[in-house]
């Protein structure tokens, strides 16, 4: 047991259901297939090499690095596919925000952006995202090796017990008190409570407010967010059931620097993909073994 959070939210990539299917979970090969199907579209609105690289590596970086055994896998086909996809985008410095910026809803609706990043901390957030796309969407998750859904939970208010503590019983009592007295309407509460009784109470409270609605605008796109419905609740519970990991930054900054430094030669056409991934593999392996 590492910690007991008091609240959580959900973090995932989403796309049109017609593009990504109805189930969560996909691989880098699946992402590449989507890109190949829509060669004129971007994966994300206002995408740059940096944003695409970080998004596609954020949840699955550990699959390329085995710190315990000092082994790296940056010469595998999945990583090569990743760099091939990233190569089509401008660098962060090359992207002209004044000239090239497009609001996400406009990019989604025109099908010039295929994916969005969705953060769920309220029962109606899924409804909001679906209306921004103006089409049925699927929480496809971040790409992995195929063994996971790629849908992650972000935790808040985590409490834990020091293994050297001489007062573990008292610590457990404090944790129990914290969970039981975590008020669902507290101004300090973000996302959803982890205690089922509190979660159910929150859902009941939201359903009781079903007649409430509010307007939401993003540039020239305006939508109406309806009060919580049973459909919203069902979609939320289904999404929670798909969560299979914690949203944490797996990326080692030094390894990311190695990747971005060496990949630049491929992006500029100075070296082949195989040459670049071989160099990344070599440098990364040396670094991991020196720091494991």
Short names for language-model regions:
Residues 69-100, 138-142:
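Glycine-centered hinge/linker elements that transmit conformational signals in sensory
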Residues 1-26, 47-69, 153-161, 254-263:
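Periplasmic solute-binding protein
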Residues 2-3, 40-48, 181-193, 286-292:
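Bilobed periplasmic-binding protein-like "clamshell/Venus-flytrap" ligand-binding domains
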């Amino acid at each position: 047991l590492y910690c007991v959070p008091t609240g959580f939210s959900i973090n995932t990539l989403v796309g049109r259901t017609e593009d990504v299917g109805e189930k969560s979970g996909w691989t880098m090969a699946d992402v590449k297939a989507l890109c190949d199907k829509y060669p004129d579209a971007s994966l994300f609105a206002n995408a740059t090499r940096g944003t695409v690289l970080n998004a596609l590596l954020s949840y699955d970086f550990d699959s390329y690095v085995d710190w315990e055994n000092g082994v790296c896998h940056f010469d595998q086909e999945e990583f090569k596919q990743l760099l091939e996809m990233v190569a089509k985008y401008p660098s962060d410095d090359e992207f002209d925000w004044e000239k090239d910026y497009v609001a996400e809803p406009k990019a989604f609706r025109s099908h010039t952006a295929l994916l969005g990043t969705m953060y769920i901390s309220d029962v109606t957030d899924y409804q909001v995202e679906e209306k921004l796309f103006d089409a049925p969407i699927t929480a496809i998750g971040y790409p992995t090796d195929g063994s996971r859904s790629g849908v992650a939970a972000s935790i808040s208010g985590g409490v834990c017990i020091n293994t050297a503590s001489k007062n573990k019983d008292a610590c457990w009592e404090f944790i129990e008190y914290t969970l039981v007295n975590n008020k669902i309407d507290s101004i300090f509460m973000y996302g959803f409570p982890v205690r089922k009784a509190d979660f159910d109470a929150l859902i009941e409270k939201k359903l009781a407010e079903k007649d409430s609605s509010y307007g939401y605008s993003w540039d020239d796109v305006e939508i109406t967010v309806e009060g919580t419905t049973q459909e919203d609740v069902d979609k939320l519970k289904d999404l929670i059931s798909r969560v299979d990991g914690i949203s944490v930054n797996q990326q080692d900054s030094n390894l990311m620097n190695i990747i971005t430094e060496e990949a630049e030669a491929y992006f500029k056409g100075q070296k082949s993909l195989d040459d670049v991934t071989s160099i990344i593999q070599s440098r990364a392996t040396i670094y991991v073994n020196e720091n494991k």
